[in-house]
């Protein structure tokens, strides 16, 4: 059976939960619902935080939570099924299978996680912010104004979906500044208002041009 999920990591974890709840671990395939066309029997999994949390805790106990998450962020074609194969191995053996490099699924997951980690490290080092002269009024962006003036903007073009990975670093580093990091290839942005951060997808926000060189003030 093909299990379709909403394309989020929480949705993927819920799908793993559903597969085991239905005792279909030996016959299941996982695909994002977006773009998945099939004539085979399929089931769409609803995102439920309780189920995702239970699977997340189990992955931590097995010592594979970080690797699974990083590899999932690669968004490589069919990565979900390699991830599920690794999870199955971990559950069957009661420990991490990531040293079993003779298995294709383990090699694929390890390679994907490595690529995401390398790219994350690169953008943590080389992301460049510029100051926007006028703060844009966009939904989801609440700038405190007088107490935290200014808005800093950075555009990145990563090969992998790393906004969630780099968010904690930049929030800690610039905790008293308002900033936006735009992932241009994916049309989404990390928005921080000096209090809270979130990932948003507003076309108007993505279309905001960077300041001209004469207007740039680096952060």
Stretches with model-predicted labels:
Residues 1-51:
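N-terminal ordered "arm"
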Residues 2, 29-34, 47-52, 59-219:
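Extended, charged helical/alpha-beta scaffold domains that provide interaction surfaces
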